[in-house]
Amino acid sequence: MRNQLICLALMLCALHSASGLYFHISETERKCFIEEVPDETTVIVNYKVELYDPRSNGFMPSSPGIGMHVEVRDSDDKVILSRVYSSQGRISFTSHTPGEHVICMYSNSTAWFNGAQLRVHLDIQVGEHAIDYANVAQKEKLTELQLRIRQLLDQVQQITKEQNYQRYREERFRHTSESTNSRVLWWSLAQTVVLVCMGFWQMRHLKSFFEAKKLV
């Protein structure tokens, strides 16, 4: 029982998936991130772009002329979102296929700012953690207890999605393993057939050689 509770707690912690970071890019550079996302799961991307100021040797809020082009591809390499946003924004999308989703960002470079260095603050939230429960409570007029129950139900639903996704990955891995084993088997059989044929041909050739030399 204790082990089950520990596993459940670890899964709940994993569901609160959020990654906050910042990185530096030039205006012509493209940066991509990969997120493992179950199907029918909400993903929220918050970002803010800052422009390097050589006079102050620091970063300042970017000008209105600099925005970010955001492109999202699903596990089938299908573009599900491609759009130019402002220098600061919040992007939301829902996955419809499980697997790796690639989120790419690059600036809409202009001749005036071309080559400038940018700092991009990025926060990616996946699953139950992407839901703004304060807004949900206000909109649906939920009490604290009702809100807590809602959170628990969402967590259980997300756990189910995660379990389905893990089963999906196991099935794909098993299919890949079976396919690889089958190819190895057929390749081994092909090698065996080739070796047998070569041995038979060499024996016939040697026999013909000996007969021609009247050694047999």
UniProtKB/Swiss-Prot annotation:
InterPro entries: Emp24-like, GOLD_dom. Pfam families: EMP24_GP25L. Keywords: Coiled coil, Developmental protein, Endoplasmic reticulum, Membrane, Signal, Transmembrane, Transmembrane helix. Residues 134-164 form a coiled coil. It is found in: Endoplasmic reticulum membrane. The chain crosses the membrane at residues 184-203. It is a single-pass type I membrane protein. One of its GO terms (cellular component) is endoplasmic reticulum membrane. Residues 1-20 form the signal peptide. Residues 204-216 are cytoplasmic. Residues 21-183 are lumenal. The keyword Ubl conjugation does not apply. A motif (Prevents secretion from ER) lies at residues 213-216. PROSITE patterns: GOLD (PS50866). Residues 30-126 form the GOLD domain. One of its GO terms (biological process) is dorsal/ventral pattern formation. SMART domains: EMP24_GP25L. Eca and bai are essential, though not redundant, for dorsoventral patterning of the embryo. Specifically required during early embryogenesis for the activity of maternal tkv, while the zygotic tkv is not affected. Involved in Golgi organization. Belongs to the EMP24/GP25L family. PANTHER family: TRANSMEMBRANE EMP24 DOMAIN-CONTAINING PROTEIN. This is Transmembrane emp24 domain-containing protein eca. It comes from Drosophila grimshawi.
